[in-house]
Regions:
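Short, flexible beta-strand-to-coil junctions
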Residues: 36-39, 57-59
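Short, well-ordered secondary-structure micro-motifs
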Residues: 45-46, 179, 234-235, 281, ...
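Feature activates predominantly on carbohydrate-active enzymes
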Residues: 2-4, 8-10, 50-263, 269, ...
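Substrate-binding groove of N-acetylhexosamine-processing glycoside hydrolases
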Residues: 2-28, 34, 75, 79, ...
Length: 629
């Protein structure tokens, strides 16, 4: 398709980038685009004959409108008009590039920014605990995937041309376990992952962080974190200053951080859960408790509060909770979630249901700014480009009161190349015979613990006994295999998902089969497991590792892959050990296989499916391998 543009020069770079992505030629020929910017105007597209008229308020509205025009033309429509009104002032994703060690490389991030603009999303955050360089602090992000100042400036420049505001998102209190492991930060460390409040060196450090995080970006906005500091003041702080109420410690810290922020001319926002947790308002997500005056007074002037909630399906919940948060700040930002952080799977049903309800209530209650969080807890096994379907959801709900799923599927296909029906199957990695009867199966991440649990000492074997898991994953592998070749940029992701399911098709019940054969004295079955099944499993796992590695190096910075190599490597070693023990038992050199003689107990003493088992160290062994691994 050839398109001639009569538009403001400020759109030229973005148009050129979109031409590469959407494969149109910028030249006189088939269509002419005439664009006008009118502040505060709804997005509108009018196509008559070969003329495309676009009215827009922001750059990203123009690119969404351009995409809508091309999409409808490709679908065979000739003369049509489209008008959309953005429901939110800002709307876009926050990608966690720290907790799981998966930091997008610049090529990937630029491609994502292009797609966000095409969707009509005008904001993006990169959540960095220590994934950015801090001046004069070489151990901050040392040997971790981090962005240089030049990297972040390059991304900000690119995003700006596409109408996407990039906002730095950091931590200035807790959630800093990786940098605080180094002794060079001992003077500013309260406990494992929290900064030492009241120590002057802490605020020198925070100043350096704020300067380094904000300097590459045009915006003055900055997210300063400060969530989930559950043990605040109970480590070195207590040794130095004695006991003080958490409320006082938070107040003192915020006051000092705000002095730095005001001096630097920044516009802060923060997660607001600590206001509720510190002041004893009986939980963060409880709608029925009044907000004490002292809580309201604790919020500094100029601080925007971010209410995060990705869990609830009930409209009444959000209707009850949002007013409590609005009592803290004149401008509350809502942060929902794209559920990819519990293992190998995208929990699409939960993402869809929670987002539809939450954003509808946000519209009705006057929430202007929306964040779609994409966390990376404990390994980021789920490939992060999978989250684009969630970004599409937040985008469409940002322009429409509700969505028609057929129209959504077509829109997602146009913007990304992905097939909705295939993406809907991704959650079947966790939604299996164990969890299908449950009301909310997304709380159960079977794919993760079935993949990483040990063969000889399976801590989860008791809870999975009696379910046809191998058959489930064998069928799912075929579904993923069929998806390869029709999902464009996601074909590699479906190849990865195929290999995950292909491994689980024999590994899920391997420990159970091995234990039964041993206890039954079935030496023929044991020999088959040692000579055929376990070597087959190892071969399948090696293929999975190589495909995973290919995807990782295509999407992310290389640093961070070491975590996954260590996980796969431990499985390979344990498979080898299992084979050696079985063969030694069969030839009589090993009197018994002691691991298989242990009684299998329900995990945590609880019957039924295991809920949200996400720490690798809690899956692979009953012994400590590393803190919080």
């Amino acid at each position: 398709m050839k398109i001639l543009f009569q538009a403001d020069q400020s759109l030229s770079y973005g148009i050129n980038e979109m031409s590469k992505y959407l494969a149109f030629e910028i030249a006189a020929g088939e269509y002419t685009v005439k664009a006008r910017q009118i502040d505060g105007h709804d997005l509108s597209v009018c196509v008559k004959g070969k003329e495309i008229n676009i009215i827009y308020a922001e750059k990203c509205h123009f690119f969404r409108a351009l995409g809508l025009a091309i999409q409808n033309i490709n679908e065979g429509k000739e003369d049509f008009e489209i008008s959309e009104k953005p429901a939110f002032r800002s709307n876009g994703p926050m990608f966690d590039v720290s907790q799981g060690g998966a930091a997008f490389n610049l090529k990937t991030m630029k491609k994502i920014l292009c797609q966000l603009s095409l969707m009509g999303l005008n904001m993006a955050m990169i959540y960095c605990e220590d994934s950015y360089e801090v001046q004069n602090r070489p151990y901050f992000g040392y040997m971790r995937p981090r962005y240089s100042e030049a990297d972040m400036k390059e991304l900000d420049d690119y995003a700006y041309e596409l109408g996407v505001e990039m906002i730095p998102c950091i931590q200035t209190l807790a959630h800093l376990p990786d940098p605080l492991r180094w002794k060079v930060f001992a003077d500013v460390k309260d406990y494992t992952e929290c900064l030492l409040v009241g120590e002057p060196k802490t605020y020198e450090f925070i100043r350096d962080m704020l300067i380094s995080a904000s300097r590459p970006f045009r915006t003055k906005k900055i997210h300063i974190g400060m969530d989930e500091a559950g043990s605040l003041g109970r480590g070195k702080y207590m040794d130095m200053f004695g006991y003080k109420p958490t409320t006082q410690i938070m107040h003192d810290h915020l006051e000092k951080v705000m002095e730095i922020i005001n001096e630097l001319g920044l516009e802060p926002m923060m997660w607001d859960d600590m206001f509720f947790r510190c002041y004893g308002t009986h939980g963060y997500h409880q709608p029925d408790n009044p907000v004490p005056e002292e809580v309201k007074a604790a919020v500094p002037k100029g601080m925007k509060c971010v209410y995060w909630d990705y869990y609830h399906f009930d409209r009444s919940h959000y209707e009850g909770v949002i007013p409590r948060h609005k009592e803290l700040s004149d401008e509350v930002i809502f942060a929902g979630g794209i559920w990819t952080w519990v293992g190998f799977s995208l929990a699409w049903s939960k993402t869809l249901k929670t987002t539809e309800v939450a954003l509808d209530v946000c519209k009705k209650m006057g929430i202007s700014d929306i964040i779609a969080t994409v966390w990376g807890d404990n390994g980021t096994e789920c490939l992060a480009n999978t989250t684009l379907i969630g970004c599409q959801l937040f985008a469409e709900l940002g322009y429409h009161d509700n969505i028609d799923m057929d129209e959504f599927a077509a829109r997602f296909k146009f913007c990304t190349g992905g097939e909705l029906a295939d993406f809907e199957n991704l959650e079947l990695l966790d939604k299996n015979p164990l969890t299908e009867p449950l009301k909310d199966p997304s709380n159960y991440n079977a794919s993760k613990y079935l993949m990483w649990q040990d063969i000889l000492t399976g801590l989860c074997d008791y809870n999975i006994d009696g379910y046809a898991l191998n058959d489930h994953y064998e069928g799912l592998a075929e579904k993923f295999k069929a998806a390869i070749g029709r999902n464009g940029q996601f074909d590699n992701m479906f190849e990865f998902s195929y290999h995950v399911a292909n491994v689980l098709a024999i590994k899920s019940e391997m420990g159970l089969r091995l234990t039964r054969a041993y206890k039954a004295g079935d030496k023929e079955a044991l020999l088959d497991i040692a000579k055929v099944q376990l070597p087959d499993l190892k071969a399948r796992m090696e293929k999975l590792r190589l495909v995973h590695m290919k995807n990782w190096f295509e999407l992310y910075k290389p640093l961070g892959w070491d975590i996954m190599d260590m996980r796969y490597g431990s499985l390979f070693a344990r498979i080898d050990s299992a084979i050696m023990e079985i063969l030694a038992y069969l030839d009589g050199s090993l009197e018994r296989i002691e691991e298989l003689e242990q009684e299998r107990l329900p995990y945590h003493g609880e019957e039924g499916p295991i809920k949200y088992l996400n720490y690798f160290g809690h899956i692979v062994s009953a012994s400590r391998i590393a803190p919080k691994a």
